[in-house]
Amino acid sequence: MEIGNVKADVNLVLNLREAERHRRYFDYFIDEILWLSFLGMSETSLKEEEVTLGGVKETREEECSDDKLVLDICLKRKRLDEEEEEEVVEEENDGFKTPTRPENRIPIVRECPPAPMKRSSEMFRGRTMYCRRRLSFLPEDDVNSFITDLQWRTTTMTIKK
């Protein structure tokens, strides 16, 4: 295999991918035509219409191909889809509406609000307050008994080795 122009090779690959995509659309279109012909439509049929012009009746014959019929069917399907969407919109209209009076509108902000600030100092103060709690209910007798009890325990303890 020879190494050729890379740009041309890339374009060739892209063109092949594009052709594959179009082939899929073409296959889908052919499937639709086959489905319509399965329903009894021929590839080319004659259409007869009676036209009355001032009391003289004429019969016109026109050729209709499946392409026209397919386009008509697609347009009818599209119209039906649009009608279904309109019905859905009507179902959503349940009598409640967003108020539109000026007093119910959100005011226009002329200036941006200031940027949010860190609140670490408040959190730090809160922590220190919990750590430095003062005991205001201790009378001197309770404090003295507590201290003497601690002194007695420390003097009577023996260190084991």
UniProtKB/Swiss-Prot annotation:
Q: What is the lineage of its organism?
A: Eukaryota, Viridiplantae, Streptophyta, Embryophyta, Tracheophyta
The role this protein plays is:
Probable cyclin-dependent protein kinase (CDK) inhibitor that functions as a repressor of mitosis in the endoreduplication cell cycle.
Q: Name one GO biological process term.
A: regulation of DNA endoreduplication
Which PANTHER family does this chain map to?
CYCLIN-DEPENDENT PROTEIN KINASE INHIBITOR SMR12, CYCLIN-DEPENDENT PROTEIN KINASE INHIBITOR SMR13
Q: Which InterPro entries match?
A: SMR (IPR040389)
Recorded GO MF terms: protein kinase inhibitor activity
Q: What is this protein called?
A: Cyclin-dependent protein kinase inhibitor SMR12
UniProt signal peptide: none
Gene behind the chain: SMR12
**Disulfide linkage:** none
> Looking at the record, which segments are called Disordered?
84-106
Source organism, top-level taxon: Eukaryota
Which terms are listed as keywords in the entry?
Cell cycle, Protein kinase inhibitor
| Compositionally skewed regions (Acidic residues) per UniProt | 84-93
